[in-house]
């Protein structure tokens, strides 16, 4: 059995998957915030419960935000303070007496989608998350590409390209990002960015779901806003696709629930690609909230 943990600031979620990659059991517990020992205990107790329930010693994979293993072997995850700065992989491997694998939660999202029954035909899969932030991951032949600093797929921290500034206006604000830079595309293409763009042009502080509801009702202002957003997304994504050239792009995050993102994006891409390039297949993520657990569990399918 394959055990996959999706660990965040508020919850530790475990999913148990069989050899057919089907979810057999799941359980969630709160994430301890202050005690590293309590954090380790929470993970180990879930593993022990799964071992007992299924009568086996399952493999363990963990998806967690941040950098799973820095040069000194410690975790960097500001959202999980109890474990940040600690040698999490080594400690869990020792306590559980098995090989524990860690990866970034965005890579686990992409890995989950790449192992979808329909998507396994594609050698190079790109996951793109349009949610609270913008991120993603790259999967090649069923294995995540992490890079030495685990920042492969941090698409949100690419800067706005020149074509975007031409489209939006040369006086378009280059907003300061949480990473310390200015003009990162996350500030414009995330769910928060989607709402910020609307307020910037129409001076109305609406949230993304409210804007989408107006769009669905045929509101002309909301429709013009969505057209502008999709054009901006196409410009930025065109740069990424020129570098990566994936077979498939799977879009997740809150904005992926808005059908226009996946149905209207492909037609906008050719003008931003090389003439010989082919637009990849673009799909909405298939596995929703279970994606993080799935991808973490499937870290052991990559041997």
From Swiss-Prot:
ATP binds at residues 4-11, 133-140. GO terms for molecular function: ATP binding; N-acetylglucosamine kinase activity; zinc ion binding. This is N-acetyl-D-glucosamine kinase. Zn(2+) binds at residues 157, 177, 179, 184. The keyword Metal-binding applies. It holds the Pfam family ROK. Disulfide bonds: none annotated. Catalyzes the phosphorylation of N-acetyl-D-glucosamine (GlcNAc) derived from cell-wall degradation, yielding GlcNAc-6-P. GO terms for biological process: N-acetylglucosamine metabolic process; peptidoglycan turnover. The keyword Secreted does not apply. It is an enzyme of class 2 (transferase). The lineage of its organism: Bacteria, Pseudomonadati, Pseudomonadota, Gammaproteobacteria, Enterobacterales. InterPro entries: ATPase_NBD, N-acetyl-D-glucosamine_kinase, ROK, ROK_cs. The gene is nagK. Keywords: ATP-binding, Carbohydrate metabolism, Kinase, Metal-binding, Nucleotide-binding, Transferase, Zinc.
């Amino acid at each position: 059995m394959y055990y996959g943990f999706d660990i965040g600031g508020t919850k530790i979620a475990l999913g148990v998957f069989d050899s057919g990659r089907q979810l057999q059991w799941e359980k969630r517990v709160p994430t301890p915030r202050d005690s590293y020992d309590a954090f380790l205990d929470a993970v180990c107790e879930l593993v022990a419960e799964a071992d007992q329930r299924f009568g086996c010693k399952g493999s363990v994979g963990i998806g967690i935000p941040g950098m799973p293993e820095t040069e000194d072997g410690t975790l960097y995850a500001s959202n999980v303070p109890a474990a940040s700065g600690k040698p999490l992989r080594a400690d869990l491997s020792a306590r559980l007496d098995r090989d524990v694998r860690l990866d970034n939660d965005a890579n686990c999202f992409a890995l989950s989608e790449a192992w979808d029954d329909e998507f396994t035909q594609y050698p190079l899969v790109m996951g793109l998350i349009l949610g609270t932030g913008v991120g993603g991951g790259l999967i090649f032949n069923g294995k995540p590409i992490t890079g030495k600093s685990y920042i492969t797929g941090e698409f949100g921290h690419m800067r706005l390209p020149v074509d975007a500034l031409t489209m939006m206006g040369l006086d378009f604000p280059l907003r300061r990002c949480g990473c310390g830079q200015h003009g990162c595309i996350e500030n414009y293409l995330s769910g928060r960015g989607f709402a910020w763009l609307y307020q910037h042009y129409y001076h109305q502080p609406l949230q993304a779901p409210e804007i989408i509801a107006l769009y669905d009702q045929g509101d002309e202002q909301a429709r013009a806003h969505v057209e502008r957003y999709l054009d901006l997304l196409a410009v930025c994504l065109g740069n990424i696709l020129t570098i990566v050239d994936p077979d498939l792009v799977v879009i997740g995050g809150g904005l992926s629930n808005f059908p226009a993102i996946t149905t209207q994006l492909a037609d906008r891409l050719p003008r931003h690609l090389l003439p010989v390039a082919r637009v990849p297949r673009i799909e909405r993520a298939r596995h929703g909230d279970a994606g993080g657990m799935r991808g973490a569990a499937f870290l052991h399918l990559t041997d």
